[in-house]
């Protein structure tokens, strides 16, 4: 009965019926547009823009605009979107996720809503996972938009600011998710409004949306600067950790990836470093370095988590298997790995700006996405991004044969069987794609195939430059390709001549991923557009997923049956157990991402306030009123501190107040105790503010209005940037230890919100105090110019204990700020450091 009701009231079915009706309406007018000349078709863009200006909405234009793009696509590329692609386009325009199977033409589908929304002139961002796909799509699909009179931009990491600004100014901009996030952060660190590159965030269509909004949701984008620190401790901690023995000196939990010293290990450490107590406050740094060295040796594996290339430790993305060049683990883990591998240890970094993809993409007015696999994460898309997942039917039925899993007792038996299966298929000429979850697995299978004399291509983090070419050739007769973790997403595997007759592409999975979605992505490489295909997963009881969730019991059962390594089992019970393990991991990861978002929202609200005010500073012509208000707030606090309400006026420490006023706001001797004696705090405030304004006016007269306005901006920007950097670090420190509050029966999130707010208020007060002091006391130089507090560079996060996907929040970095020679001197003179206290260096 419930099943019948669900079918009757299924909202997805209703949505699809609505989309199908719109697709039929578009199809019904195709003849009108086929008869138009090229010029008449192009003129439709101008007509649509005029109608929008007169009050029409994009929804009003949808049917006609989609029909125009469809016809333009046929003329320019020779491709004519099917009805199911029109339905996918409507889903995207509605701000939803279109789940379309591999080979169903997602890229072409996106052109429909992208064109329609670009007509508003507010800009549309098409987001892809790598620069190869961004460049390819901008070139291929860009021709359609340019034919219709719209401009297309491509935003790449290597571009200058001027080139980026031009790319963002276009009607449609193709970019990677990383570049969009980093450009947003960099825009909020600029010193002049003209240096900004992005426009307000209007509409984004994300290709492979699950990869960006789910897999990478916990990845904070970080812009960091160098912090001067000694590398000696890393070397010493590394040498010590090499002497430790597993279980005896440290314990390692494979589920949570947590490593910690045992009592015996702690005693060893105290002996080795000649100290009494490793947990003494003065040994915090040593303790931290030993823990990071342990993590580097035990939890971080070479060729799985990172590779060593050209003397550098390069992080491997655990989802795509790609190298993340230029990114570094924070909290000293990267340096610990460098020490482990015997490489040159580079300086730690300090965070200047940070944002997660979750919070960046939620800033768009409208967000849409497409992928082949999103249904398993439907709840997360709905709860966090307010996006529905709409499964678009395939143009032709899927005839792929998905075989049940084959389960072996050991890894050795499993890999032998994989090599044997590949060899047999190779003999018949059937192309094979072997999917692995780690670089080392791909190299092991490659070795086994070499021994059998089977030519093959390996696609992993070490050689992803040839990725697209290898993937495109993977469907040719006799091709054998080994790929790590869905490398090659977004690139179609087209079947070569005679391959259909051999059964299509065979996909062989060597391990189940902890996410069903990634298994489905691998399956989806085969059987595109109604082609035949076959998929087979090989598992062993020693696989990480099986070990994590009770493989011991199953192993004992298999032993009782006398099962050896040459015979696999195809058991529905084991397959169900694997799937329930995956569901459990997915649930854990969803909870983890949701919790991170709640914590990150605290920093998001603060970041939005600071960035908004910072923009007002660089956009404003005159900051005089703002600066005066800052001075007044700072002065009010100073007076309140020396004239507490609970004390009698004769107990007030007026000498201290006079000293403070003269050293911070006025000149020596400008205020006497007699001036304020017997007055109420309000009267003191009025009197002192009058004198401050007089001094301010004199300063402005001396240096001229123009110079004074620029001076105010320099001071305010510098104060905001340096205090905000300190605040990010302080919030991180708070975040690290907040979970311990749960032991005191308090809600850690509530505590974090309250303390974070108090710290933010304190930061605002510090900014006001610093601005007041520098504006009133610093001297103005003739060659006045705004300067960055620290030069920034992009960096990565650090995997955290208990974080199954190795995607985690960035950890705090202790700052030791080097004063640049051209920076204002810390003594408050207003001169450059090199002309003041730094003159002797």
Swiss-Prot record:
UniProt key word Amino-acid biosynthesis = no
Q: What does the UniProt cofactor note say?
A: May bind 1 zinc ion per subunit.
NADP in keyword set: no
**Known EC number(s)?**
7.4.2.8
Q: Which Pfam families match?
A: P-loop_SecA, SEC-C, SecA_DEAD, SecA_PP_bind, SecA_SW
Q: Which reaction does it catalyse?
A: ATP + H2O + cellular proteinSide 1 = ADP + phosphate + cellular proteinSide 2
Q: What is the effect of changing residue 106 to N?
A: Loss of activity. Cannot complement E.coli secA mutants
Residues bound to ATP are 79-80, 85, 103-107, 492
Q: What kind of membrane protein is this, topologically?
A: Peripheral membrane protein
Tell me one GO molecular function of this protein.
Answer: protein-exporting ATPase activity
Subcellular compartments:
Cell membrane; Cytoplasm; Membrane raft
Record GO biological process = intracellular protein transmembrane transport; protein import; protein targeting; protein transport by the Sec complex
Gene Ontology CC annotation, any one:
membrane raft
Q: Which cofactor does it need?
A: Zn(2+)
InterPro entries, alphabetically?
Helicase_ATP-bd, Helicase_C-like, P-loop_NTPase, SEC_C_motif, SecA, SecA_CS, SecA_DEAD, SecA_motor_DEAD
What this protein is reported to do is described as: Part of the Sec protein translocase complex. Interacts with the SecYEG preprotein conducting channel. Has a central role in coupling the hydrolysis of ATP to the transfer of proteins into and across the cell membrane, serving as an ATP-driven molecular motor driving the stepwise translocation of polypeptide chains across the membrane.
Oligomer status and interactors: Part of the essential Sec protein translocation apparatus which comprises SecA, SecYEG and auxiliary proteins SecDF. Other proteins may be involved. Monomer and many different homodimers can be isolated, some of which are not formed in the presence of a synthetic signal peptide. A single SecA monomer interacts with SecY in the channel. Only shows some colocalization with FloA or FloT membrane assemblies.
Q: What is this protein called?
A: Protein translocase subunit SecA
Query: What organism does the UniProt record list as the source?
Result: Bacillus subtilis (strain 168)
